[in-house]
Amino acid sequence: MSSTQAQASKTLYGERVIAEGELICFDNPRPERPYEISIELPEFTCQCPFSGYPDFAVLRLLYQPGSRVIELKAIKLYVNSYRNCTISHEEAANKILDDLVVACNPVWMQLEADFNPRGNVHTVVRVSHGSRQPC
């Protein structure tokens, strides 16, 4: 067995699934009706670009779908892909929102990244796209 094959065989199932993941959407079953979808992802992790320490956050996504809806397993795997990513709180929230907007083109979307306090500092980053419609 070559060293490349040995390395590939050491890749854990979850790591492989995360690496292969993509944001998948499906057709909105009720595109004529304004409604909101709320998704909470309580286990977001990334790495601080300054200290290298892990950062933990709860992501709260609220959106009004257009013609497409985000598939839940796909968003879970996408969010898990940030685990070893060195990125600031602000860039993480903005990049995630941008990627979700490209994937599903919502009428309106808001992402709140509520980071666990570290060093007595609690950070919440809230970003949005589009105009919220009455439901």
Curated annotation (Swiss-Prot):
Substrate binds at I70, E71, L72, H89, E90. It comes from the Bacteria. Pfam families: QueF (PF14489). Catalyzes the NADPH-dependent reduction of 7-cyano-7-deazaguanine (preQ0) to 7-aminomethyl-7-deazaguanine (preQ1). GO terms for biological process: queuosine biosynthetic process; tRNA modification. The gene is queF. It comes from Prochlorococcus marinus (strain MIT 9313). Disulfide bonds: none annotated. Its main location: cytoplasm. Pathway: tRNA modification; tRNA-queuosine biosynthesis. This is NADPH-dependent 7-cyano-7-deazaguanine reductase.
